[in-house]
């Protein structure tokens, strides 16, 4: 008998080329206390002038021409033109904006460990609470500080750390 013809061999299937995806690197979770901004190593003055028209009094009373009495001056008054832009001294986050009968319109910005109170600003705030700001960003304009209205135009700047008042000039210049 003659051999039976065999069926042609089945071709061996060629596996389809695969592209192996790189496994995604797992990002560590962001800690709850992570800052929302990069903390600035250096600070700038918030107005064009570094001239102080009334210094921080470190708890000692100084005479107030407007109020006609002796009182502690908890901030530093920097000479500025009315309408001049007020700039953030460093990167930070706006904690609040409000109007105070003595300080006028106030923007509070957290700059690292410090809270800066920019006082006597125009009625139109240029920033909002929880907004992240960069050093040099305009946050308001100079107008008047009601409790210091007899003084020449200026920005009243206060700095606090853990609720304690500090000399703004020392903080800006890196002394504290």
Per-region residue spans from a language model:
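Extracytoplasmic
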Residues: 38-40, 47-51, 63, 71-75, ...
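Cationic-aromatic interfacial patches
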Residues: 1-18
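Short glycine/threonine/proline-enriched tight-turn/helix- or strand-capping micro-motif at secondary-structure
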Residues: 32-34, 57-87
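Short, well-structured beta-strand-loop connectors
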Residues: 85-94, 126-142
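Conserved, short, structured surface segments that act as functional micro-motifs
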Residues: 131-176
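Short, acidic/hydrophobic/Gly-rich beta-strand patch recurrent on exposed beta strands
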Residues: 66-68, 77-79, 106-111, 158
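Zn2+-dependent peptidoglycan hydrolase active-site motif and core
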Residues: 88-123
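Residue-level recognition of beta-strand microenvironments
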Residues: 55, 97-98, 121, 142-145
């Amino acid at each position: 008998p003659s051999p039976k013809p065999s069926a042609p061999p089945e071709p061996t299937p060629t596996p389809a080329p695969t592209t192996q995806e790189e496994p995604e690197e797992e990002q560590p979770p962001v800690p709850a206390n992570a800052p929302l901004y990069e903390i600035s190593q250096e600070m700038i003055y918030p107005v064009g002038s570094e001239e102080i028209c009334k210094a921080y009094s470190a708890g000692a009373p100084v005479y107030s021409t407007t109020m006609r009495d002796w009182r502690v001056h908890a901030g530093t008054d920097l000479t500025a033109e009315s309408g001049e832009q007020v700039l953030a001294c460093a990167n930070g986050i706006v904690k609040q904006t409000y109007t105070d009968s003595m300080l006028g319109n106030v923007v509070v910005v957290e700059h690292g460990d410090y809270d800066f109170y920019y006082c006597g600003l125009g009625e139109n705030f240029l920033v909002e609470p929880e907004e992240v700001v960069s050093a040099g960003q305009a946050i308001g304009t100079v107008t008047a500080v009601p409790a210091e209205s007899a003084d020449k135009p200026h920005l009243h700047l206060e700095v606090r750390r853990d609720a304690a008042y500090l000399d703004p000039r020392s903080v800006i210049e890196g002394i504290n």
